[in-house]
Amino acid sequence: MAKVLDLNALDQPILELKLRDDNRTVFRLTVPTVKQYERFISAKSEMSEIAKYQNPEKIKKLFELTAELISCNADYITVTAEELRDKYRLKFGDIVVIFAAYLDFTKEFNNAKN
C-alpha cells in the first residue's frame, strides 16, 4: 500500500512580527531557505561592527537583507528596504532585534525537528 506525505498539510512554524506603521501590519514569518539562513547568520555576526562604524552602505545592505527576511512569510507578501524604512518606520536597532528573534525562531524549529 502506498503512503502519501503531503507537505502542504504540514503546519509551518510561524513567527508573527508586528511593525510600527499606522496599521500595525503583521507579517507571519516562516523558516527561510538554506541560502537565506546562511546570509542571515553572516549578517548577524557583522551587526556589532556595523553599529560601531555606522557604514551607510552596510546599513543599506542590512535593510535589504531584512526585507528579504520579512518577505519570507506565510502570506507571500514582498517588502523592500525602502518600505521598511519609510512605510514601516524601522530603525537600525529594530533590525538587530528582528534578526535576534528570527534566529532564535529558526533555532527552535531546528531543535524541534531533531
Q: What residues fall within each predicted segment?
A:
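Short acidic, Pro/Gly- and aromatic-enriched capping/linker segments at domain boundaries
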Residues: 2-18
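Short, surface-exposed, charged amphipathic helix/loop patches that serve as local interaction elements
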Residues: 12, 25-114
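Glycine-centered tight beta-turn/hairpin loop motif at sheet-sheet or coil-to-beta transitions
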Residues: 20-24
